[in-house]
Amino acid sequence: MYLNNNNNMKYYINSPLEQFEIRDLLGLTSPMMDFSFINITNFGLYTMITLLVILTMNLMTNNYNKLVGSNWYLSQEMIYDTIMNMVKTQIGGKVWGYYFPLVYTFFITIFTMNLISMIPYSFAMTSHVVFVVSMSMIIWLGTTIIGFYTHGLKFFGLFLPTGTPLILVPLLVSIELLSYFARTISLGLRLSANIMAGHLLIVILGGLLFNLMAMNILTFLLGFLPMIAILGIVCLEFAITIIQAYVWCILMSSYLKDTIYLH
């Protein structure tokens, strides 16, 4: 935004939140018809980039009938085994295999989006609350449908723990219902808040460091010390992007387990 001082000189101030703004990159205009619904935004562009990266990752895992896989193949296999073991542990029983492809797809998608957002001057898709909460609402609705399809009206037993005294039934049912409906927001909000907070911290500290090092030669030399700390924060943010994708899948598997086994 622009600010004027007393001498009518204009200054341009970059907001740290500008990196999360959705902008039109390509669109059609016509005086007779509104074509804005087919505009290509940075969100749409990074969606296509994410799909392209995921497709490329899967094509690169082709072992071409070799007995010993490449390092890239082994890394993908390690991710696959990690998510499979997590789903098997969380859901268990004989049905975990039905839901593993869904959980794995969510992990790869969120993991790829988070890593792409760590590229300088890129766009953080998972920082948008509307997008991630929409995904969490779809998961919540899907698990609820699975619960009613599997158990019918017995699904309501999920909101009443076994052995609850009669006097506590209204209170506990209210708490369980509130907790269950909160999943529609909490799952996505957790991811969005962590990604947004990390990116804001990096941008703000990076901007302060740039201004410090641009003052004079002394501050330029002194700026290398906080630069090491900022690089450490960037490495931590890389770890958070992976952890958040994994946490999403753990909670998703936990929600599936609750609806399948009613506990």
Swiss-Prot record:
GO molecular function ontology, one term from the record: proton-transporting ATP synthase activity, rotational mechanism
Superkingdom field: Eukaryota
Gene3D superfamilies registered for this protein in UniProt: ATP synthase, F0 complex, subunit A
Record field: transmembrane: 35-57, 95-117, 129-151, 156-178, 191-213, 228-250
Alphabetically ordered keywords of this record: ATP synthesis, CF(0), Hydrogen ion transport, Ion transport, Membrane, Mitochondrion, Mitochondrion inner membrane, Transmembrane, Transmembrane helix, Transport
Any single biological process term in GO: proton motive force-driven ATP synthesis
InterPro entries reported for this sequence: ATP_synth_F0_asu, ATP_synth_F0_asu_AS, ATP_synth_F0_asu_bact/mt, F0_ATP_A_sf
Any Pfam family matching the protein: ATP-synt_A
The keyword Transport is annotated on this UniProt entry: yes
Chain residues in the propeptide: 1-14
Chief subcellular location: mitochondrion
Location(s) in or outside the cell: Mitochondrion inner membrane
UniProt membrane topology term: Multi-pass membrane protein
An example Gene Ontology CC term for this record: proton-transporting ATP synthase complex
NCBIfam families per the UniProt record, alphabetical: ATP_synt_6_or_A
Subunit structure: F-type ATPases have 2 components, CF(1) - the catalytic core - and CF(0) - the membrane proton channel. In yeast, the dimeric form of ATP synthase consists of 18 polypeptides: alpha, beta, gamma, delta, epsilon, 4 (B), 5 (OSCP), 6 (A), 8, 9 (C), d, E (Tim11), f, g, h, i, j and k.
Stated role: Mitochondrial membrane ATP synthase (F(1)F(0) ATP synthase or Complex V) produces ATP from ADP in the presence of a proton gradient across the membrane which is generated by electron transport complexes of the respiratory chain. F-type ATPases consist of two structural domains, F(1) - containing the extramembraneous catalytic core and F(0) - containing the membrane proton channel, linked together by a central stalk and a peripheral stalk. During catalysis, ATP synthesis in the catalytic domain of F(1) is coupled via a rotary mechanism of the central stalk subunits to proton translocation.
Entry similarity comment: Belongs to the ATPase A chain family.
Entry protein name: ATP synthase subunit a
Species in which this protein is naturally found: Eremothecium gossypii (strain ATCC 10895 / CBS 109.51 / FGSC 9923 / NRRL Y-1056)
